[in-house]
């Protein structure tokens, strides 16, 4: 199944807040981090790459630029009752994925390493139509583009601080993959 990051995050947060053993802190004051070691928490889970904890303990990163661009869009199509099968095609330009969202919408991720094709949005939309075998497409929304990069933390934990999610593995534009890789 595919869900938006916000829906997933909100659902997870709601369930975690019901657990009396978990405390949430909305940290506005940077001094909070310097006092964190003195609080005696058994475990601290850090998912944020912008805070002092990450910068101090987890900023030793392995970075890679894949010299590719991922284009994403939503196709609007005729209703399909069981639109629940993702498809991926390995084209000579790069992988193209059709990821169902609803009965009438499907998300597209087309990772392109062909230097000439990266600049030709009309051709990209033509290729989406060409490889599409399931949908009667009514509309293809504007293409968004993201450079494909990897950022991997060389340290997964420090004492009682655990790096998690995108703070551990960040792969763009595959939103959420850092979290998925952590679960694996």
Task: Report residues per predicted region.
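Conserved N-terminal helical subregion
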Residues: 1-72
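Active-site phosphate/pyrophosphate- and oxyanion-stabilizing loops and adjacent acidic/basic residues
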Residues: 10, 96, 150
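Conserved FAD-binding catalytic core of PHBH/FMO-like flavoproteins
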Residues: 44-135, 139-143
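Short coil/turn connectors at secondary-structure junctions
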Residues: 40, 104-105, 159
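Structured helix-beta-strand junction loops
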Residues: 18-19, 92, 159
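FAD/FMN-dependent oxidoreductases across multiple families
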Residues: 118-184
